[in-house]
A protein has these predicted regions:
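Intrinsically disordered, low-complexity eukaryotic regions enriched in glycine, serine
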Residues: 2-130, 143, 161-163, 182, ...
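Amphipathic alpha-helical interaction segments
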Residues: 80-84, 146, 169, 192
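Short alpha-helical "patches" and their helix-cap loops
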Residues: 97-106, 162-175, 211-217
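Ankyrin-repeat-protein effector appendages
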Residues: 103-114, 204-222
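Ankyrin-repeat boundary/"N-cap" motif
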Residues: 105-116, 136-161, 183-203
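Ankyrin repeat domain, specifically the short helix-to-loop turn at the C-terminus of the second helix
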Residues: 126-134, 168-180, 213-222
Length: 222
């Protein structure tokens, strides 16, 4: 099994949302899935679980830049948590999430992300060989990230900001399958995979940034 670097703050978020993350993605609508996360944030804040600060200090309009103490001692209502989760997933606001109506998560794409972030090169390769369209598919979330964007562990769902230690091989697999190394995602106003990778703490802490960046640059990434 491939080792995966997971920062302690991300581990705490995975635990915070563990019930939601076990939701059956075959039937859940995006608005329901994100709504459950917003509710978990409110409940955790009330319980004094500071793991919520990772979400709130980065994405909550009223709390960006605040200290953990200020966040935990301050007010947090459901509307604030919904806006936080909406922004984290690339939406303008919660209304934009609701506007997707009955849109459900794309299960093959979601499973492909999970295999990639787990460092499961065999499953990733087999899936892309069977369903080649996944390599250029964009997330149904507002950020519209591709698989290669997710590998950068930056600006996507917080609980997915992890780095498999075989990230170089993963990147090579994605590129060989036809990934667009200069694809734009709706992250931070428009981001390419290389920029997300090189500005993320997670690949850096995992010690793979330079090697993965070299793979991307050799494939024409800017």
């Amino acid at each position: 099994m491939t080792e995966v670097y997971i920062d302690s703050t991300v581990k705490a978020l995975q635990q915070l949302h563990q019930t939601t993350l076990r939701t059956d993605k075959r039937t859940v609508r995006i608005v329901e899935f994100l709504g459950l996360q917003a509710e978990s944030i409110v409940e955790a804040h009330k319980a004094g679980n500071s793991a919520v600060c990772f979400h709130l200090c980065c994405w909550c309009k009223q709390l960006i830049g605040k200290s953990r103490e200020e966040v935990m001692n301050g007010e947090l209502n459901l509307a604030m948590a919904q806006q936080t989760i909406a922004s984290e997933h690339g939406y303008k606001d919660w209304n934009a999430v609701e506007a997707q109506g009955n849109v459900q998560l794309d299960l093959p794409f979601e499973n492909c992300i999970d295999a990639m972030l787990a460092g499961d090169l065999n499953e990733l390769s087999e899936t892309l060989a069977t369903t080649p369209a996944l390599i250029r598919q964009q997330s149904q979330y507002g950020h519209r990230a591709t698989l290669l964007h997710y590998l950068g562990a930056n600006g996507v769902e917080s609980y997915r900001q992890v780095t498999p230690l075989n990230a170089v091989q993963i990147a090579e697999c994605l590129i060989e399958a036809g990934a667009d190394v200069n694809s734009l995602a709706n992250i931070y106003g428009g981001s390419k995979p290389l920029g997300l990778l090189t500005t993320s703490a997670h690949p850096a802490n995992a010690g793979v940034t330079e090697a993965v960046a070299a793979v991307l640059e050799n494939a024409g990434a800017t």
